[in-house]
Regions:
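The Walker A/P-loop phosphate-binding site
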Residues: 1-112, 363-364
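Structural motif
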Residues: 41, 197-202, 239, 280
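Structural recognition of the conserved hydrophobic beta-strand(s) that form the central parallel beta-sheet
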Residues: 91, 200-201, 236-243
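Helical hairpin unit composed of two closely spaced alpha helices linked by a short loop
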Residues: 179, 189-228
Length: 365
């Protein structure tokens, strides 16, 4: 039975059914990609942009690829065969409301399509109000958000690990069945073998405690255990977001210049990094006034007028199925929460630095 399952998976690979979904970062995609039964952990300090990175790499870029692959007109333009992959995303936004998430995503999409920046604060009328033309732009994206709702389910507010596990089981049973395959083993059969289901938790530090898991560590351990089960039994792809602990900024590490993220820097529990197949970390070296380990000129990635920082370092700390300890420089536009891979240090030009700060870099495809 075990070899038959392995053979079926190998055949799926030969048929191109295990290629997965691109994350929108070409260099990163050489090492990792979105496919079934993978557990991702993404960490960073507050303000590092980890939620924006999750949204870019695991939600918006995959979604845009998915609708492009499955839209006949787009397939004709790109001369591609519509993908058989079906994408489903369950997004547990425990820190931000559903309305805020959608506003951020629309703001990003308007900028990509139109080159117009409408910050979330303006979109929602917190301070300034949109002009008539800006409002007309916003209304153009109703169908885009409607298409999102067919693929992405946003659930806001904290929950405990058992509650989330029950919801994942209910979702699995709505989209498949569980059978007893022999005396000892059960197996889950999805209705659609080509469906990739991402389960995003932002962030695990907000998992609620219970009587059975009264401490934060126990709650996170339980959640990671349930995510591992969802990966192994249902074939789901969990993506957990985690805060770093404070040791990354202690005086001794700052003095030694040793502030680059390590596995030990993930807060509260070691279970998440042990259970995850892939561990990624975002780091803002400007925050600690240290040089970038890859050698980018950080002074040229800082807007001297506004103080906006346009750089983050992404490190692939753990990769169970390939190369790790990989660093990639990312240009970061915080106004709309957008990331884009920078040229390698040896290839970056003066015009690249300038384009990043004046934001035209983010519009180049």
């Amino acid at each position: 039975m075990s070899f038959e399952l392995l053979k079926a998976e190998v055949n799926a690979g030969l048929e191109g059914r295990n290629n997965g979904i691109p994350m929108g970062f070409n260099r990163l995609n050489k090492y990792i990609g979105i496919r079934k039964s993978m557990y991702f952990l993404v960490g960073g300090l507050t303000g590092s942009g980890k939620t924006s990175f999750i949204d870019d790499a695991f939600v918006l870029n995959p979604f845009d690829w998915y609708i492009g692959q499955n839209t006949p007109k787009m397939s004709e333009i790109t001369d591609t065969v519509p993908s058989k992959i079906k994408l489903r995303i369950i997004y547990r936004s425990m820190e931000r409301s559903r309305t805020y998430k959608l506003a951020k995503w629309v703001s990003r999409k308007i900028f990509i399509d139109q080159g117009v920046i409408i910050p979330v604060a303006k979109l929602l009328g917190w301070n300034d109000r949109m002009s008539h033309d800006e409002h007309d732009l916003f209304l153009m994206y109703e169908d885009y958000i409607g298409a999102m709702e067919d693929v992405i389910t946003i659930i806001d507010g904290p929950e405990n690990a058992v509650g989330i596990a029950k919801e994942l089981k209910a979702h699995a049973l709505q989209n498949g069945r569980i059978e007893q395959v022999d005396e000892y083993n059960k197996r889950y059969f999805p209705n659609n073998e080509n469906e990739i289901t991402l389960v995003i938790l932002d962030h695990v530090g907000l998992i609620k405690t219970t009587k059975d898991q009264p401490t934060k560590k126990e709650a996170i351990d339980k959640m990671s255990d349930e995510l591992r089960y969802a990966r192994d039994f249902y074939g789901y792809t969990p993506v957990a977001v985690s805060q770093f602990n404070r040791s990354i900024s202690n005086m001794q590490r700052l003095k030694n210049g040793d502030v680059e993220p390590q596995l030990e820097d993930f807060a509260e529990s070691s279970s998440t990094q042990n259970d995850a197949d892939v561990v990624l970390a975002l780091f803002d070296p400007m925050r600690y006034k240290v040089a970038d380990s890859s050698g980018y000129d950080l002074d040229r990635l800082l807007d001297k007028n506004t103080g906006a920082k346009y750089f983050r370092s992404l490190r692939l700390i753990k990769n169970s199925y390939g190369e790790d300890d990989v660093r990639i420089g990312l240009a970061f536009m915080g106004q709309i929460g957008m990331f884009k891979e920078m040229p390698k240090r040896k290839d970056i030009t003066d015009s690249d630095y300038q384009a990043i700060v004046d934001k035209t870099f983010f519009l180049n495809t």
